[in-house]
UniProtKB/Swiss-Prot annotation:
Assembly notes: Homodimer.
Keyword Methyltransferase: yes
Up-regulation conditions: Up-regulated by yeast elicitor treatment.
Protein name in the entry: Anthranilate N-methyltransferase
Length: 364
């Protein structure tokens, strides 16, 4: 009689590989229920669980203690919280120790969950997580099969318009979108500014598609000599806060961009197809002097699929883009180089990679 843990032999690149059938089944089941993890994490964020643990003496609390701090009226709250937190421990989002004769579980933060606690600037990835889990985004997945079979953009098929049109007409979704970008930019830029020194000799910097201006505000704060222009659609910049040294300018990057000796684009090119990217980059080329440069911050997808954490993150983002943008996608180093050359730039320098954002300099 066969074992419940039956194994079979596979070959990978000519080498025998033993794969445990139980492990394969478990992984398939986990994929079938994968939505549970982000939803449980978001629930913990909404309840403020990570902040509560972060503020606790010793940095550890039981589910009962968390429920008390939350002033939960539901008598089953401690049990419900404990079940959610146990799941997060199994994915290393939290860690756990057992205390006392009753074996009470005490939960603490890990290096992952610290990103769901607002930092000194109030930024956390919890606000970023709210975007892909927003009802508007979630509904877009219902349009993927039809888009594959018949064409079109999943988001457009479901909502009847492009995501940026939708955001301009739906203030709630627009707030969620820009809050996500604000928080991601705040967290990423702090670390980028520690490693990337390419702004030191810039005198006039234009952030194309800069949203509410948080990216430029952080750069201008570190480099106050820079004349900073935050450039985005008029309805976007009209809601932007005032920052020292930052001027907000409304316009359309497909028509023209303000002049500067350096132009910055963070998470912009991956929103558009190659033809649209070339239009944007050619406008940037025209707006920079002979010794100018365009600084692109974007994920870079490996030439062949990988299983590293960064490659998984990039692939997740790439497929997310597929649901909302017609030609938007993550690109390889080779594809970015081809875009740079195609727009007239002489070359590209891959300066560094921080927070899975590759900082690329396109030189004239």
């Amino acid at each position: 009689m066969g074992s419940l843990s039956e194994s079979h032999t596979q070959y990978k690149h000519g080498v025998e590989v033993e794969e445990d059938e139980e492990e394969s089944y478990s992984r398939a089941m986990q994929l079938s229920m994968a939505i549970v993890l982000p939803m449980a994490t978001q629930s913990a964020i909404q309840l403020g669980v990570f902040e509560i643990i972060a503020k606790a003496p010793g940095g550890r609390l039981s589910a009962s203690e968390i429920a008390t701090i939350l002033q939960a009226q539901n008598p089953k709250a401690p049990v419900m919280l404990d079940r959610m937190l146990r799941l997060l421990v199994s994915h290393r989002v939290l860690d756990c120790s057992v205390s006392g004769p009753a074996g009470e579980r005490l939960y603490g933060l890990t290096s992952v969950s610290k990103y769901f606690v607002p930092d000194q600037d109030g930024a956390s990835l919890g606000n970023f997580m709210a975007l892909p889990l927003d009802k508007v985004f979630m509904e877009s997945w219902m349009g993927v099969k039809g888009a594959v079979m018949e064409g079109g953009i999943p988001f457009n098929r479901v909502h009847g318009m492009h995501i940026f049109e939708y955001a301009s007409s739906n203030s709630k979704f627009s707030d969620t979108y820009h809050r996500a970008m604000f928080n991601h930019s705040t967290i990423a830029l702090k670390r980028i500014l520690e490693h990337y020194k390419g702004f030191e000799n810039v005198t006039k910097l234009v952030d194309v598609g800069g949203g509410l201006g948080v990216t430029l505000s952080m750069i201008a704060s570190k480099y106050p000599h820079i004349q900073a222009i935050n450039f985005d659609l008029p309805h976007v910049v009209q809601d932007a806060a005032s920052y020292p040294g930052v001027e907000h300018v409304g316009g359309n990057m497909f028509e023209s961009v303000p002049e500067g000796d350096a132009i910055l684009m963070k998470w912009i090119l991956h929103c558009w197809d190659d033809e649209q990217c070339l239009r944007i980059l050619k406008n940037c080329y025209k707006a920079t002097p002979e010794n100018g440069k365009v600084i692109v911050m974007n994920s870079v997808v490996p030439e062949t699929p990988e299983v590293s954490s960064s490659a998984r993150e990039t692939s997740l983002l790439d497929v997310l883009l597929m649901t909302r943008d017609g030609g938007g996608r993550e690109r390889t180093q080779k594809e970015f180089t081809e875009l740079a050359i195609g727009a007239g730039f002489k070359g590209i320098n891959f300066a560094c990679c921080v927070c899975n954002l590759h900082i690329m300099e396109f030189f004239k």
